Amino acid sequence: MTAPAPPSAAASDAGAPPAFAPYVPDRESPRELTLRAVLLGTVLGIVFGASSLYLFLKVGMTVSASIPVAVLAITIFRALSGAIGSPRATILENNVVQTAGSAGESIAFGVGATMPALMILGYDMDPLRVMLVSILGGILGILMMIPLRRAFIVKQHGTLPYPEGTACAKILIAGEQGGSSARTVFTGFGVAFVYQVLMEAMKLWSKEPAKLITGIKGYDKAVIATEASPTLLGVGYIIGLRTASVMVGGGILASLVLIPAIAYFGQGFTTPLAPATSALIRDMGPDEIRGTYVRYIGAGAVAAGGIISMCRALPLIVASLVGGLRSMRGNGGLQVDMSGRTERDMPISVVILGSLALVGAIAATGLIPTNAVGRVVGAGMILLFGFLFVTVSSRLTGEIGSSSNPISGMTIATLLLTCLIFYMLGWVGVEYRVAALSIAAIVCIASSNGGTTSQDLKTGFLVGATPRAQQWAIIVGAITSAVVIGFTLLLLNNVYTDVTDKPEYLPRMSAPAEAIADAPTATGPDGKTYRVWWVNKGSDLAQPGKYLVDETGKPAYRIDPGINGVVKTRADGSEATKFTPPQPALFAVIIDGILTGELPWVLVVLGAFLAIVIQLAGVSALAFAVGVYLPLATTLPIFLGGIIRGFVDRRHRMTAEESDSSPAILYSSGLIAGGSIAGILMAVREVWPWLKRTLDLSPYLPAGWSERPGPAVIAFGLLALTLLWTGLRAKPAVAAVGSIDGNGSAAR
């Protein structure tokens, strides 16, 4: 198909859309929104949504699932066609699959970033709340983005590149020629899955080899460790050497500078240094120092980094909002042209009424647990902040891509504004903390899914899809993914929850009689029945959390959650597995700091100024801050993946576009998915102790083998070599196939 000539200046000035010829012409109507496409898309969305949630809980970030989902759709349909003789899938069916399948990753980010903060504040993570927030936020983001499609996708085609959406369109067009790319994804998935099972279930080598630095007087609490994880290795390759280097720099500062410095200067203290309440610094290990002091420094740095990234994008944010509102007032917004197939959006009446119905449901279902006035105010803030940040997110993903979209910064802004409004209204009671978090969670999920929806609609615009079909597909994908992601979050938290009776984790005072009079009961590890005592943030009775107390109120056990928990060692002496994403802790700090005023502000401010210094030095403050918050063991394997990508890119002299579509990127996507799914299954294994004991081969190995660093380093090195070999053996072919020409027209 011959590309049309560029539009004239007059046409451009008149606001007419640029001349564009998609891959599938408007006059053709191939199969698109079919049952098989929607079913496959929802299944892949569930798989990648669950794996994205696991990844987020590990490192506080996710990676786009659109490209691997598109590749898998092409190959699976091709295989089914050959095996059972079903009709070959059209490119538009494949596009529906990737559209429905992409919702899981964006919802996973929003849910993982916000919902665990409930437990840090001292509340239970109610399953119904998690499900409703996930579903309502996901659908709201889609509906609010639909009126912006013509403004951002059509009228600004050629101005807003939408990098991931354009790359996915190239994958779909290239998929008409073969399926070798999918084999690369499946290979990475299989390698990572087997590796994770051998390491975590069979315990053939250590999951986290570590070395305590010794030999320097006074420098005795610095630990170099790495998590031998295929998931983190894949993440490092995808985000690249620059970002991976910045993250590991933050990890080095925290583990090899801040922790040893605090230990050195605090070794002479004879009283606890706040926020510690009982332990002396000289008696703390590296993990305790991190949890007591460095965690708040990291939270302050993450908050400042998120705000900085949002401020840097402020001109784009203002332009996005003004442009979106202007376009909706003109012929590009509410008056949708229904004459052509590729212009058919979901009816605007459905969008408006659906958005209002969702907000009404939020106010009516008790998601905002306040009085009637508080619910109405909260629903209004969701509507206002939701549309604001969905507009911002949709525009920014077009400008800088999903990976650089500052969703965390938008959520911080929402939470700050919400808490300040509550504070000015005098709403500082216990219920308003949950209300503030619920508002921020819905806005976070909506803005995240709004950005993903815009990328999907860009892909559809390039390949010639029907927008309405895509919009229904991603709504179905959002609902199914949200339900599974909610269950996955609860599963991962519950199976890694620990019950401890160690005195250092228990309150020194008894629970008030009125606090446990009507409390539910639970059975403790000793078989006795106890009352459940929830201690919320702001209480001076005990650290926030869940406790089991006897009838007199005396604490007997602490129920420590699997996400952002504080217990490091189980009762049997084994290491407790915990997820420590930075965002939930940060959001809890913001709510606690504004509504209760009780916060170690000195440490938070130190972290904020640290982020400012890093930004002034020309380095991404947010990536560095995440590195400060996460353990060095998490950022080191990410750094190794980044080093491998840097070497491969230099060896092949690839452009950024070629590198982003290379075989090693697809292999890394497989590593992430395979390692994450295996990790989720390892969590399920905790439910059946007999299965856990059966798979454990460490008793048959030499004494101490599974704890030695050597076997883990060798195994992880071999895994890294498979990634290096994949990157070196072939240059990408995708970028050259089905390319988008200078006018943005798809060459067919």
Predicted feature descriptions by range:
Residues 1-748:
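Alpha-helical multipass membrane-protein architecture
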